[in-house]
Amino acid sequence: MAIEIEALEPDLAEAYIDFFDHRAFSDGSPYYPCYCNAYNMSTVEIEQMREAAKRFGGGAEGWQKSLRESAAQMVKEGRIHGYLAFDKGIAIGWCNANDRMNYYRVGEFDLDHVPEDRAPSGCRHEKQIKSIVCFEISPEYRGKGIATMLLDRVCADALAEGYAYAEAYPSDQVQSSLAFTGPVRLYEKAGFTEFSRIGSTIVMRKKLR
């Protein structure tokens, strides 16, 4: 297994969508459908996406189509950042990582109850905190170190880009098999420590420089 990690760029939009269409939730995950775009969307944009779902016919199918269209456009516009893991040219894993200033919210949340847009706490400017908000690995590749490879790449690139910290937001109430923000132990192994808590969200940081 020769895994390659690539930073998401607009020309990888097709691979990104293909991953979420066919492999990310092939085990019947309760998070399907998802295209990992809501972190980068304001509540107004999310409401617009709900209206678009109605135009697509409503119901689960309309919602999936609306999510998909929105995510594809956001990748092409460079609004979603992160890393795809590939095995023989097929995307099998994803990590959503971006400048903290580019997220409207972090931590676990349900799209049926989206938290209000909030200015980032503990982050005053760009290039200070690289945030890691989500992991998704194809079921047959879980437990093989793919998330660790993705996390290591995020931290290495963040250091090279001049960030002071990498920051993650695992939950203390979600079983590890469903923890799309990543389990605590993943971050502990990579040198992250608890920085603060916001409700059930554990804010974990790693000092990069």
Model-identified regions with their sequence ranges:
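Conserved acyl-donor/pantetheine-binding loop and adjacent beta-alpha core of acyl/acetyltransferases
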Residues: 73-77, 86, 90-134, 142, ...
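Conserved GNAT acetyl-CoA-binding A-motif
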Residues: 129-132, 158-177
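Short, flexible, glycine-rich and Lys/Arg-enriched loop motifs at helix boundaries
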Residues: 38-40, 108-114, 170-183
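Short, solvent-exposed beta-strand-terminating loops
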Residues: 22-35, 95-108, 156-158
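Conserved N-terminal entry element of GNAT/NAT acetyltransferase domains
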Residues: 1-54
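Conserved acetyl-CoA-binding loop-helix of GNAT-fold acetyltransferases
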Residues: 116, 132-137, 143-159
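A short helix-loop-beta-strand connector motif used in the catalytic cores of GNAT acetyltransferases and
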Residues: 47-50, 55-83, 101-106, 131
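C-terminal "cap" of GNAT-fold acetyltransferases
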Residues: 179-190, 195-209
